[in-house]
Amino acid sequence: MQGIILQIVGLLIIITLIILFFSKPNVDNVETKTYAKLIGLNFLFVIIGITTYFIARLTSNLNLIGIFQKIYMSILTLLNLYSMYYCLFVYDKEKRFIKLKKILFIITIIAILGILFLPLNVIYKGDLLDGTGLSYNVAIGHTILSFSFFIIITIYLVIKKYSIKKIIPYIILIILYLVGFIVRSYYKELIFEGFFYSYILFIMYNTIENPDVKMAKELAFQKELALEASNKTLNLICDIENNLKS
């Protein structure tokens, strides 16, 4: 059971995010739309991960486990794709990278087909649930591609002296994965991908344009304008009174 503890925590985080994000109006832009897709995909990702674990525990049917593992890895590639899209959408205001987005989409489709149709060797021993084979390698390769993309984008933004605030969660994701692989060398049964994505999406929630904050700023600005206009009116009345008295 300890193998999916992180997945369960990840599920609690993503459910909380879904409630927070969809329970109030959001700014209608590409950033929030992409973020909505990310949290939706991550919810499915975690659910499939937990379901796969229980199917393994209850049935030990390697063929059925393999099918769910392939679905799990396919959703991971979509998470990677929309994460790369997110980085481009946030910074590509002039839409200069349309061709790059198409290339990333095509690579992802090919990766998903490879995951679904290439052989996968299911590893299930005790609490350990893993896989090897060409299908697994394709999923790992696509994840490495996305991480390389995040690093390149970060370097580009630093060189151009742009803010990297919105891409920091993905740098944290890379660090978490590296730490996760080290920890997994000692606790091989741990499944951490869903938890890590839930965690960085929680961080991202605080970097996207918050409609409540935006509204509060607009109200404060309107209040300041009204106060300034009121002061000018009072000053004008005082000046008129002084002129009448003189």
What are these regions (language model features)?
Residues 1-12, 107-156, 180-186, 190:
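Extracellular-loop-to-transmembrane junctions of the mid-late helices
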Residues 3, 158-221:
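Interfacial "cap-and-anchor" motif at the non-cytosolic start of specific transmembrane alpha-helices
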Residues 4-86, 103-121, 170-185:
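Hydrophobic alpha-helical transmembrane segments of multi-pass membrane proteins
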Residues 16-22, 82-86, 143-164:
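Alpha-helical transmembrane segments in multipass membrane proteins, preferentially the mid-helix core
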Residues 34, 99-100, 131-139, 154-175:
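Membrane-helix boundary/juxtamembrane motif in polytopic membrane proteins
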Residues 61-72, 127-139, 192-197:
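Non-cytosolic membrane-interface motifs at loop->transmembrane helix junctions
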Residues 84-95:
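Class A GPCR helix-loop hinge within the 7TM core
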Residues 223-246:
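PAS/LOV and related PAS-like sensory modules
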